[in-house]
Each structure stands twice: as C-alpha cells, then as structure tokens.
From Swiss-Prot:
The lineage of its organism: Bacteria, Bacillati, Actinomycetota, Actinomycetes, Mycobacteriales. Keywords: Ribonucleoprotein, Ribosomal protein. This is Large ribosomal subunit protein bL36. The keyword NADP does not apply. GO terms for biological process: translation. GO terms for molecular function: structural constituent of ribosome. The keyword Nucleotidyltransferase does not apply. PROSITE patterns: RIBOSOMAL_L36 (PS00828). SUPFAM superfamilies: Ribosomal protein L36 (SSF57840). Belongs to the bacterial ribosomal protein bL36 family. One of its GO terms (cellular component) is ribonucleoprotein complex.
Length: 37
C-alpha cells in the first residue's frame, strides 16, 4: 500500500474507488494498491 498525495491508475486493471471518504486504487497487481493521504 502506497500512501500518496495524488493517486493515479498505473495500468488498465486499476480501479479508483472511495472508501470511508478516502480515495483508493485497487488492482490485481498488489504493487498498484494506493491510498490518498
């Protein structure tokens, strides 16, 4: 999980979602998991 000021999709499988008011990226590739913070 990377915590970054701005989250972006890295590949086509990445999905940007909101959980508990946080913007997150989820993907099949676990290296692509990101959270905005």
């Amino acid at each position: 999980m990377k915590v970054q000021p701005s989250v972006k999709k890295i590949c086509e499988k990445c999905k940007v979602i909101r959980r508990h008011g946080r913007v997150m990226v989820i993907c099949d590739n676990l290296r692509h998991k990101q959270r905005q913070g």
